[in-house]
Amino acid sequence: MKSRYLQQGMYAAVFTVAAVQVNAASPVDFSNLVEQVSPAVVSVNVVKKMTQEELLQQQVPEILRRFFGNQVIIPQQQGPQEKTAYGSAFFISKDGYLVTNHHVIENASRISITLNDRRELDATLVGSDERTDVAVLKVNGANFPELKIGNVNQLKVGEPVLAIGSPFGFDYSASAGIVSAKSRNMSGETSVPFIQTDAALNPGNSGGPLFN
């Protein structure tokens, strides 16, 4: 089983977005914050080219893969082999720039987003970085609800935080927790600090923001 840190503390914690401050001395009610920021959080719909390993897993029984490994011959298929994947993103400008995770759009042949009002827009990839797991998308349009990127240096361990995503094109999902640690580095990586949180992250929330 993957550790809680890797499974829940890394995916949506890449981004910290400044919002209203809460009083940690009293029970935290995030309802107003959710209402304020959720329109800027969108669902990302991706059509991806399948890798050789994914084709192997899909078409060859596990027992054969275990014994023969890469020596298994995959039957040739007509046309490109693709799959559909989902994630989340959020607007950082009114003119259509969004931030998500690199692993959400990696190997994508087509990217679209679903807005809070159910409109679907085609998105183009502006750029992405595998090491930091950050990607920037662009959609045509104007007057999108935007979020302001916060200052991670002002974030404190133990501070209440809220994770929001828009998985699978459904209504947004929200979960609350605290900042468990700052400046975490993934194993084998250097100079890529992450925020660790115990907020539960649902499937499809990758790329969504974390609010303080």
What are these regions (language model features)?
Residues M1-Y11:
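Bacterial N-terminal signal peptides that target proteins for export
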Residues A19-V22:
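N-terminal signal peptide c-region/cleavage motif recognized by signal peptidases
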Residues A24-N212:
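Serine-dependent protease modules
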